[in-house]
Amino acid sequence: MTFEMLYSKIHRATITDANLNYVGSITIDENLAKLAKLREGMKVEIVNINNGERFSTYVILGKKRGEICVNGAAARKVAIGDVVIILAYASMNEDEMNVHKPCIVLVNEKNEILEK
């Protein structure tokens, strides 16, 4: 049996852009994504602290420092300046669950790393 467990998260990231006309996804600063162990195409859940919206999408690696841009239809669920939590999960068996420690990255309002 496997269980869906928290794999990693970026906590309290600030939305820097929302692009309704781009094909879906969330663009995340490549350095920040790598630090959080997120890979291009990986499914993530976004929790908007400002309005309570929760939605799933996939990661695109961005080039701009601090970039967090929600694309496509999901852009309607955020506003520039909103604070979000970006979560990734992984399927694990009980042995994996017992040793796994999620990667948690805390950022400031400019999406600069405070703590990992």
From Swiss-Prot:
Keyword Cytoplasm belongs to the record: yes
BP GO terms, sorted: alanine biosynthetic process; pantothenate biosynthetic process
Listed CDD domains: Asp_decarbox
The protein's required cofactors: pyruvate
Catalytic residues identified in the record: 25 (schiff-base intermediate with substrate), 58 (proton donor)
Cofactor note: Binds 1 pyruvoyl group covalently per subunit.
Gene Ontology molecular function terms on file: aspartate 1-decarboxylase activity
Alphabetic keyword roster: Autocatalytic cleavage, Cytoplasm, Decarboxylase, Lyase, Pantothenate biosynthesis, Pyruvate, Schiff base, Zymogen
Modified residues (Pyruvic acid (Ser)): 25
EC numbers for this chain: 4.1.1.11
Annotated compartments: Cytoplasm
Main location: cytoplasm
Pfam families assigned: Asp_decarbox (PF02261)
Residues given in the record as substrate binding sites: 57, 72-74
UniProt GO cellular component terms: cytosol
Keyword Lyase: yes
Catalytic activity line of the entry: L-aspartate + H(+) = beta-alanine + CO2
Pathway membership: Cofactor biosynthesis; (R)-pantothenate biosynthesis; beta-alanine from L-aspartate: step 1/1
PTM note: Is synthesized initially as an inactive proenzyme, which is activated by self-cleavage at a specific serine bond to produce a beta-subunit with a hydroxyl group at its C-terminus and an alpha-subunit with a pyruvoyl group at its N-terminus.
Subunit relationships: Heterooctamer of four alpha and four beta subunits.
Record's function text: Catalyzes the pyruvoyl-dependent decarboxylation of aspartate to produce beta-alanine.
Family the UniProt entry places it in: Belongs to the PanD family.
Protein name: Aspartate 1-decarboxylase
Source species taxonomy: Bacteria, Pseudomonadati, Campylobacterota, Epsilonproteobacteria, Campylobacterales
Gene that encodes the chain: panD
